Amino acid sequence: MKFATRPPRTCGEAARQAIQCPAMARRGSYLLISSLAGAMVSAVAHAAPAPATATSTLMGGARDAVEAPGEGWTIVDLGDAWAPYPLDGAARAGGDVLPRYRQTFIDLASGRFGGDAMAAEDRALELFGVAPSLHLVLAAMDDEARHRCHDAIAPGPLLAVKTPMRREPRERAQERRRALERTRGRVDAALRRHGVGSVAELRDLNPSYARLVTTLERAEAVDAAIRALQAHLVCDGLMVAGAPRGAFDVTTMRALAAFQRRNWIVGAGELDGDTVDALGLGSRELDLRLALRVLRVRVADAAGLIEDGSARGEWGTVLGRQLDPAELRFQGPYPALKNGAADRISPATEAAARALGWSDFASTRAGLRALLSGTTRQVAVRLPSPPAYDRTPLELRAVIDRGDVVDADPRTRRGQRLARAATHRPVLVVFAGEGADEVALVRWPTTVGGWKDEKLSSRRVVRRYKGSDLGARAWRDLVVAPAWYPPSSTPDDELLGVRDGKWVLKEDLLGPGYRSAYGLVMLIHHERVDHGDHSHMLDHGIRTHGSVSYRSILTGSSHGCHRLYNHHALRLATFLLKHRRYAVRGPVDEVFARTVRRPGQRWRIYRRDRGFYFELLPPVAVDVGAGMTSRACES
């Protein structure tokens, strides 16, 4: 491991000490794009340290010669070998070994799942923090057969859906369809009996027929919506074309969940408002929004941006489009922070998009074709000027507001009553600057501890309150691709699941990986203990970390840790590493072994890769507030 004994005097010394120097820039080949001059692109070659020039064909057919960019330009990597800064550039800047998970991340983003059955089943991983490569985005945009398939589906049945539709048990689906056929038969018989030619005429005959027609219309609307949904899922290759239609079964639910993941929707396979809206946009518009979201990831990572407008409850748009659904802009009843930072990510993404010549589906597809057929995937763009507070190193602190804390087990009647009354969810706020100049950069939903099952030494499982630490803490260790080593108190059943009808070990929960219990990034909460002439850091097992358990972030609790969406955790890690000094500690090998049992079966867990560690210098102060404990009189 490498540690700094004093601040480096030069960037060269920073590299030797494995300490990142934010001013350092990597030389290479990239495209130069000016947002002021519209869509101007040309190839530039660099021979470090002297900048070079080159001439190439510009977008639109013009030709020009440009110099290598200097002050005011941001280099954005749009290639397939890109990985987020914590998995790549942060260690590379210190000349250190790269995290082992980097190549796995790149493979997953390119749709190469190897032997990872869970990733292959998840398919679209953007919602879990792994945005697809632009080659995959372009392949979707170029799939005209898929677009025509979607175009042929009438929008009416889905637009008529007013309440969420969910998976229905097989028996209920069969009975619903039998009832539909019976109702159709009754209506047909009534039409023949009275010699009328339409259900509208039949409705007007008497109130009884009016009720019968209304029943038929409602049943047919449900059936038509399910069939239209399934047709869209077939177009996207998420369902088999010849599969039975008309029942919202498990197959449909899983296919819809994959559609939701691909289109940035927090869902579990239910047909809700966000999903209906997405289906109504059309496949070309959805692919354009996917391209813009991927560009947003790359731009925010390159520029080290974190400000998304959440601190003031005002999220910007990109090319007139709100790229995030309401659940990913969750703020609850909290008012805007007076010192909240404006959204910087959306304007930066729009500047990059316009500089690339992206304005609609056709121009974006053409731009991607040109970019990905060229010899370089790096572009240099002029982004909006940074605010005065944005400097490096940046004074930072974080506050976790626990919100309304329910102190009773939600499985009890009292706990359910308190949970329903709780309105303020836990939030994480990151501040920059000091005193009157302090700015709130983001305010994101998170979790705090709650009531969970715990295994005793006798192997008996009991319910216990797993609270979060309160008071002053510090983020010192930042870990990317962390593995979760379940404590002995974790019940064996929580480490097992059923797959293809068989009990299996939840390898993905252990990690490293996007489905790890710690997600793609974790920050350890240390308590500083002073002893006069020296101090030491205590680790109580609490972390701020990424997670794919998005529903828990919005409505649930944790075992004491503070969960974030994986993309938020990655963005936070990138921001910290680009705005603070740090030491590269590298991979930490720590052996973990445990036997997991259920009647007649046993599994052996073995891990030795705990994750890739960075040490923030100095640590970032974190204050975990008590929140407002919900209490009620016992009846």
Predicted regions and their residues:
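Bacterial N-terminal signal peptides
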Residues: Y30-S42
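Low-complexity, intrinsically disordered or signal/transmembrane-proximal segments
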Residues: Q17-Q20, Y30, H46
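N-terminal pre-domains immediately preceding structured catalytic cores
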Residues: A47-S635
